[in-house]
Amino acid sequence: QTRETVEEYPIIDYIIKENKQAYQYLEKQLSRLPRNENVKVLVVDDSTSTRRYICSLLKRHKYQILEAKDGKDVLEVLESQKDVSVIITDNEMPNMNGDELCVEIRRLYSNDEKAIIGISGADSSALSSLFLKNGANDYLHKPFNSEEFYCRLSQNVDMLEQIATIKRQANTDYLTNLPNRRYFFEESSKSLKYLKKSNQDGALAMLDIDHFKSINDTYGHDSGDEVLKGLAVCFKKYFEKQLVARLGGEEFAVYFTDATTAQALKRLEGFRQFIELNSQEFSQEKIKFTISIGFASGPIYQIDELL
């Protein structure tokens, strides 16, 4: 009775203060709300009234909301709005059912890229398993109460964020926040495959801090780290449109995706000169250093060969 009374009002949530978990849930929800403003949810249903109801629930929790009336609309929205995080879809719709839509979405995106929540008012107990087997992350039976809706939605958004964090940590160098060696090899290899198909040349440069060991020996490893971090900031800005990475130690790499050999060489020489003139600004000890650059280009389609 309390639930039914409370849910008549446009509240965000309500919590019964029974135990410590209630306060932990409250804290989690309060931290969740500001982040929801950056989360796009796509609501799919051929029923206008159902879409409006679900959108009203999402609006309370500050989600960005997109709508579609059938599977065809969904695929068009996902083509233009690639940052959609969650798709909430009904099952019985014209042209394409919800379980069929799950299959189409999973052709393009994995479970850890976009979450799908199926909903249906059908009495069939097999429908939930059909949704899940076809790629949905979760399922709700209509009519559902707002509490369950919010809990399931939050859990799926949390899961996506946690996976994104793990991926980011796995692909990022902890010291410089540049992409690491693993990510660089994966992404540049994908690009080289495309270049091979289109009969284009690849271009890659390796950069190394000259006599970096002597910097660590003379000024200490903390100062050496400052030098690496300062160089990384300039590196990222100077080659903003290129794939850059720290390969390890004092070695960095840049893969050119949209530059001719002449343009790449000119850019690299400009960067080398900039570092030579401004390197003392990277550390408290005003350590001056220089960099050496190796460059390779041509019809080479294995990243190991270019390196």
Please state what every model-predicted region is:
Residues 167-186, 207-221, 229:
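Conserved nucleotide-binding and Mg2+-coordinating catalytic segments in signaling enzymes
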Residues 244-246, 287:
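A short pre-motif secondary-structure segment
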Residues 217, 265-269, 283, 296-307:
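Catalytic-core segments of nucleotide cyclases and related cyclic-nucleotide turnover enzymes
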Residues 208, 212, 231, 247, ...:
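Hydrophobic framework residues that shape the active-site pocket
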Residues 1-13, 100, 112-113, 122-138:
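Alpha4 helix (beta4-alpha4-beta5 surface) of REC/receiver domains from two-component response regulators
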Residues 70-73, 97-101:
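Acidic catalytic/metal-coordinating carboxylates
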Residues 223-243:
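Active-site-proximal alpha-helical element of nucleotidyl cyclase-like catalytic domains
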